[in-house]
Amino acid sequence: MKLQFFHVEDLCRFIELLLTEHPAERIYNVGNPEAVTVNEWAQLCYDAVGANLKTVYVEGHPQYRYFCFRDYDYYLDVTKQTNLMPDVKPLAEGLKESYEWFRQNRDAVMHRPYAEYIDANI
């Protein structure tokens, strides 16, 4: 399964570009042109926080109960976006920046019981 991410700053840059350039195309898929597997994504997340990844594969539980992505590729053709805006923030860089923001703003983040649900049911 491959996933495709897009940094919010890139989304804002792209919207600004659409508003200022008025391209002929009106419909765009947006995203990072490089997709990653779930394992690659997990490794990048752990790298961003400076931790070692220990992968545990869960057997006997439907994946959809604890993991927000279904078992198919989430990959869009972003050729039209890339033609207008060829440079996007690499996923690893965006993850590191997001983690640093979280560390500096931990008290402002609204916590949800999602992790507790996973702990209680797996």
Regions found by a protein language model. Give the residues of each.
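C-terminal substrate-binding subdomain of Rossmann-fold SDR/epimerase-dehydratase oxidoreductases
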Residues: M1-I122
